[in-house]
Amino acid sequence: MKRHIELNNEIMIKKDGRFQFEKDEEAVRAYFIDYVNQNTVFFHDLKEKLDYLRDNDYYETDFLDAYTFEEIKAVYKTTYAAKFRFPSFMSAFKFYNDYALKTNDRKKILERYEDRIACCALYFGKGDGAKAIEFAKLMIRQEYQPATPTFLNAGRKRRGEMVSCFLLEVNDSLNDISRAIDISMQLSKSGGGVSLNLSKIRAKGESIKDVAGATKGVVGVMKLLDNAFRYADQMGQRQGAGAAYLNVFHADINDFLDTKKISADEDVRVKTLSIGVVVPDKFIELAREDRPAYVFYPHTVYKAYGTHLDEMDIGAMYDELVNNPAVRKERINPRQLLEKMAVLRSESGYPYMMFQDNVNREHALNHISRVKFSNLCSEVLQASTVSEYTDYGEPDDIGLDISCNLGSLNIANVMAGGSIENAVKLAVDALTVVSESTNIKNAPAVAKANREMRSIGLGAMNLHGYLAQNGVAYESEEARDFANVFFATVNYWTLVRSNELAQETGSTFEGYEGSKYASGEYFEIYFEGDYRPKTDKVRALFKDIVIPTPLEWEVLRDNVNMHGLYHAYRLAIAPNGSISYVQSATASVMPIMERIEERTYGNSKTYYPMPGLSPQNWFFYKEAYDMDMFKVVDMIATIQQHVDQGISFTLFLKDTMTTRDLNRIDLYAHHKGIKTLYYARTKDTGQEGCLSCAV
């Protein structure tokens, strides 16, 4: 066994009744001595290195040519002067295994962590040497982390896109379906995750050109997509990933769910495609009242009304659809369907759930479109309009699909840095550069939306880590107080920066005029309420940090009314599971799954203690499976008030829970205004062992 693996494993060998957390730092040092230093290509100086990387097609040239060599050198000097050290073996291993640039045979390392940060900073700086240094400082302090596609690809010659995720509307014709599959493969090849709204597609047994029973339904399309994503990956570096969403009132809903049953036939089962169900309030109402529900055949709805089922306000239209004899429908028991979804989620983790009316009550751009579906991780929630792809030689009618480039603030390091304003504004600028430099020609509706909407998705990580290291329990009132203040402040500074960019460029996103931002409605909660700390503990945490007052929110509203916003969407909290290891941060805003994670790589086991874990804060690092999920819902609901898009909300379940227990959590989440529920993870309590006594 390699020395760094041995040292890492010694964490678990108790000494004086305690885990040896200090062994992880020794493992990092050994990893650098035995692997990183031995396998890093040596260059005499920076110029030789950059010349080699450009001449051998590792780095793009244009972004570097925008600077003088002295400016480039200053950025690299900034990152190396920070004397950054990985605090855990897992963080170092994750970076050098997954993110560092390597030679074409992948045997030698061409970038250290400082080099990757410098490269990203120069890319974001767009020729402004001083701004590039600011980006470098922000990222080497680990206050901001670009999402994996951006961090992996920025500045590289042979790369995928830097945008993290894409959402495609699918219209109801073979042209549209085949084009959606083609675009999905192109986007997957570029490193993005792709979700598709299948709610417009005819259900199984509907008519084609008045021939009854001719259609095959959504499952056949899902099978094609499943194979497409497995085939199209990013040069073997990143697997293709896709998701399909369906409205719960679509007649194929049961067949759709059956694709994830463990016992499903191979002709039906989708192996890698994720699935999500869009749930309007009306369905929840029918289930609560134990009334029968009707699901509808979407083509008959379109023929009767000229509007697609998923674009209707089901709450307003449901009774009319039920009573219209021209609309084909089928009676179901909504409670049984909720139970079926609960069983599936305990078995497979799917489906995701999007509470459509919770989303659209808060959505600021309903005048463009209601939100009809979400993305692969259920945090991107935007307006979209469907395209119509015609035969060759005829013009296509290009709508608005969705793209969102993501990045995350490391809460602990932002708080330590003392300026939420500085971190947020620079993060918004970095995300904006990626948005503006992205033009995906193979996906015309994505490219159009990116040009017009300029959507970004700033998120966060390390919430549980920060709380635990400051002696605050995740389920406590103080934790919710902290989250309320922090995310209200982040929201404020994203709006300020978007407003500043609108003033600097003289440009707003397409459709700003009809939005809740333009009317001022969006801002009302902030000057009607006070989002400053309410508990002594949280007041102390924010002691030296500027928090906006209700009066400052009113001033911001007036500035936005006068000059507009540059971005249609600003905030989205992704799960950021992989990249959080590089940051030595707890993932997203969710509680931890384990105090000490065990990972297997090849024939070796490695251990990852949570950031800053010690005997003193052990019990503040309470594991998610031991938490009251209703309190976790309360936390996410608190944060959701301040996030214009969504939060990737993972449910943590024990195998002793019943479907009734899960349905109670779902209904409580819906009641609290949660927008989406992501993957459901179930823990096998039969294998449970208690580590608490070994602290």
Locate the predicted segments by residue:
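Extended catalytic cores of very large enzyme megasubunits
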Residues: 1-695
